[in-house]
């Protein structure tokens, strides 16, 4: 029944909207949830669905930060316009590693890593990394506390960290936030740049998935279009709340709690995978 599929789409949209911006891996969570709750659709559609619904989350970022990211915003001074263009150039530079490395390798990683055990291991490894990095930085003041002071070189290396998210369970936001902190930015700068970097990265990735879907001879019927729209709209609404939460959270707290969450979830998944294999 279509109504059941739409309810599932809403549920998946909620998962996407929450986990896309928290450093816990949205794709990993969607794959995990679909182990128990699946759309009654073919594999090709589900793989495309997991990526396309990220567009709702991206539109939420564009809405929240529209004035800041718009170089043509009325009332901006010449200096503010210059800084906006410089920010976009940093974002473009940070996309280069993904274009050169992640895009060519995407199909291979999708074929070999999109199942439970690699996701669980990635959750645990990066959970440990978050806790360790936060402990190392506890007594250190960040060198970069404003995006305007972040160098193009730093932006490029943050983009290199983003490539790590090609492994499901890593988290794109987690990899870039972790990388930015290692490179000396404050948590606020790390979170903001992660939001901005997501716009071209995820638009591009979603576009590639959509093109591949149609080039492979697939098509969308009315029900599938409706499922995509409902899930994306839900992800958009939930993302508005999740982004606000994270931007407020990082002003007062570190990312240790997310590291602990990742370790617990990853461990439970390994146990689940073991019993599933045995029984």
Swiss-Prot record:
Alphabetical list of InterPro entries matching this protein: UppP
Catalytic activity: di-trans,octa-cis-undecaprenyl diphosphate + H2O = di-trans,octa-cis-undecaprenyl phosphate + phosphate + H(+)
Highest taxon of source: Bacteria
Bilayer topology annotation: Multi-pass membrane protein
Keywords recorded for this protein, A-Z: Antibiotic resistance, Cell membrane, Cell shape, Cell wall biogenesis/degradation, Hydrolase, Membrane, Peptidoglycan synthesis, Transmembrane, Transmembrane helix
Record localization: Cell membrane
GO terms for cellular component: plasma membrane
Record-listed E.C. numbers: 3.6.1.27
Additional free-text comment from the UniProt record: Bacitracin is thought to be involved in the inhibition of peptidoglycan synthesis by sequestering undecaprenyl diphosphate, thereby reducing the pool of lipid carrier available.
Name this protein carries in UniProt: Undecaprenyl-diphosphatase
Originating organism: Streptococcus pyogenes serotype M49 (strain NZ131)
Chain's gene name: uppP
